[in-house]
Amino acid sequence: MLWKRWTLAVTIVVLQLAAVLLFARGFLPSRVLLPGYTESRVSTEAPFQKAIIMVVDAFRSDFAFSDQSNCPQLHKRINSGGAIPFTAHSTPPTVTLPRIKGLTTGSTPNFLDAVLNIAESDNSSTLANQDSWLAQASRDGRKIHMFGDDTWIKLFPGMFDDCEGTASFFVSDYTEVDNNVTRHIDTQLDQKTEWDVLILHYLGLDHIGHKTGPESPFMPAKQKEMDDIFDKLYNSCDDDTVLILLGDHGMNEVGNHGGSSAGETSAAMVFASPKFETAQLTETAETSPLPWTDTYKYHSRMDQTDLVPTLTALLGLNTPKNNLGVLVSQMLGLWSPEDQLNVLKNNADQMVQILQGQASRESDAKEVYELYDTLNSNPSVKDYYNFLYEAQSYLTHASSNYNTNDMLGGIGLGLLSTILALTVFSALTLAVQGLKRLYLIILLVYFISVFGSSTVEEEHQIWYWITSGWMAFLYISGSRNKFGDGFNWMFVQVFVRMMISWNQTGQKFTKKDDIVTWLSKDGNHPVLWILILVTYGVAFNKVWRYGFSKVESKLAFLLTLITTFASVGFKITQAWEAGEVVPAPLLYLMGLPGTLNEVNARMAGLARFAFSTIAAGSLYRVLSLAGTDKVNLIRDLHAFLTLFLITQSRIQNIPLFMVYYFLEIFLRKATNRSFIFSSRDIYQTEALFQKLVLVLSVSTLLLEQVSFFSMGNSNSMASIDLSNAYNGVTLYQIEFVGVLTFVSNWIGPLYWSTAGLSFLLEDHVRNAIFAKIAEKNNDVKLTTKLVQQALTLRVYVVLAFSSVAISAVMITCFFLREHLFIWTVFSPKLLYQFVWTVLQFALVDVILSSIFVVLVYRSV
């Protein structure tokens, strides 16, 4: 029976994976695009012959235009009329690859591009066969040179006459990655006849944001560096060259991006040329800098896709076939009144072709067609813009090409896995109907919450209340017989409250004060580092007592000291390199400061050494399985995992592991005292057994959810943390970076997953009680059987939740696929749930649990 249930568990996992893949195929298809290239020739004279495109990754509008920016040369050019500034709206997902697609083709990228964005070697997103302003320039015989982010080379293979790429995801480096671009400038400016378009894409500012946020002490210097480069390029321009400075997206308050907040969607865009100073393109003179505002709206507003028809018109190129951008009106002064109408006509004729491919005249696009018809008789500039903006709005918000059959098929498989998981779960918990009903209510509450955009954005609030309520229920039920037996639950609640208060997340309260904010304030850094060192002391004790417990005592102490010191040294060096305040004695201990290259090399070496010793110790412990030692395997591996997870954490989150440690202790004590020592039914094996397993399994599952959000995560792609994704990595390798990215963002769930296994399999009090039960029943193998059954029930607790969760999210995305927030709220939630389902629940909680069953309890 046991192995049948495990076979069914594997079947449920397969059903979930199939559901995810099938639904994704239907929900995330590529947008239908018009094939081919625009062939008609532009009849108007081009104001410029050359263009320099300077992309500063994550160049938020306030970095360029506010009184808090450090770009004096840019402000000077704006005030003189030589530069025309805009705040350019970046349509989510606000990550580099889809934004470059939008900036070159003029079309709105598919949300799947956000997933492909992290695959450095991915070629599925190439634009080699799509129309873009680069394709039009190349077909017109123009020469294009590109230096910087290698995403351009992946998107446009073979299109550059000269190029050199830099790795866009190696966020640990923000100096050399920009120097490798700047070193080409002098040569390129001296050889202007060799190119018609020069593209420079700088990544350093974005990397600083990922590492230390927009208020990093390194940010002003980086802005000044970009400003100096802009000034150098501007001074090299003649009246035939236009310089465009832009950000591909912005960043949020912590330096990440991918979501839809004002900071992430507000990028800087500047058109500059000496010709503008005499052309007087704007009616009123622009002034810069402007007062900082949290709306990030400065100067005129435009959509990023508007760059495409504007640039092609400025260079005398055809507008790409799938462009949804509108030529910015501020540039019209460069043409005669007659040519102004001609360039707008080109834009309108191109856009109406897309409209004809997506909607008939009898559809809801009828009013847009009527505006186009008015252009047939003496149209004015205003008439053209009326049509262009209405067409842009309609086409931008037009429905995606969903495959509803695949979506329904995925939902069907998800519901089937839910039915199977809940059926077996119910059969395994017949003796604890009350607890089972409460868990099912939790699943129902979560299922309902997924249908609200606000509850998805603030999901952490759901788990905070559910977890606190669950622990309160256990406190009440555990102290019915003797009040003192429930005393430990009070400490459990205290530490849960500390987890909740550690990081503010979500959308509504992200700027509210939390524990991390207090620890980061001036004057409080000594407290932070004391807590960090105490946490490392706790981790040292766990690794020494448990991780190297099978090694001779003195050698174990030495190995633990070396392993822990490597991790501590790495975090100290990483903090200093990121601009954090580090106490002088710790800097002296690590021989800091030093040159940047020395520090980076030292960091990589320390991280690799720490990882190697942790891996070696874990491998030794697995290979040393023998006799009764096997029952402590998970506890010992959990000690090594804790040190690894600390190494992968942000500095401010390291003390959370001390909170986890004490919560783990009190949760273990609370369950033992409340449900074993105080139990009146000590010999009622089934009821006691099911109660214990369900209490611990649900508790640790809830703590997985709470700990995920307590680390500062959310359901927004902007909260993905890349600051520890390159620890120990010197060259970009998607396999290692992918694993480290998952680990550094799922730290809490990984911790509580292994802690939950240890609770069930290796608690000596519980096993002693089970031994007594076995003795009472005259069955010497009953203890091992109970442990195996406990693991089985835990797996089905997880499968019940994961099946309900993925089904709920897929159903939500199906019925709300026309919702205003489908791409900004529900689609990111779907991607997060995919990761939860495939990596955390299926791989970690189910498959690894199965491996432990085989490794540790093979005797039955």
From Swiss-Prot:
Glycans are attached at residues 123, 180, 672. One of its GO terms (biological process) is GPI anchor biosynthetic process. Keywords: Endoplasmic reticulum, Glycoprotein, GPI-anchor biosynthesis, Membrane, Transferase, Transmembrane, Transmembrane helix. It is a multi-pass membrane protein. The chain crosses the membrane at residues 408-428, 438-458, 459-479, 487-506, 524-544, 555-575, 576-596, 639-659, 692-712, 736-756, 795-815, 834-854. Pathway: Glycolipid biosynthesis; glycosylphosphatidylinositol-anchor biosynthesis. Its EC number is 2.-.-.-. One of its GO terms (molecular function) is CP2 mannose-ethanolamine phosphotransferase activity. It is found in: Endoplasmic reticulum membrane. It comes from the Eukaryota. Disruption phenotype: Defects in hyphal formation. It is an enzyme of class 2 (transferase). One of its GO terms (cellular component) is endoplasmic reticulum membrane. Belongs to the PIGG/PIGN/PIGO family. PIGG subfamily. Ethanolamine phosphate transferase involved in glycosylphosphatidylinositol-anchor biosynthesis. Transfers ethanolamine phosphate to the GPI second mannose. This is GPI ethanolamine phosphate transferase 2. It comes from Yarrowia lipolytica (strain CLIB 122 / E 150). The gene is LAS21.
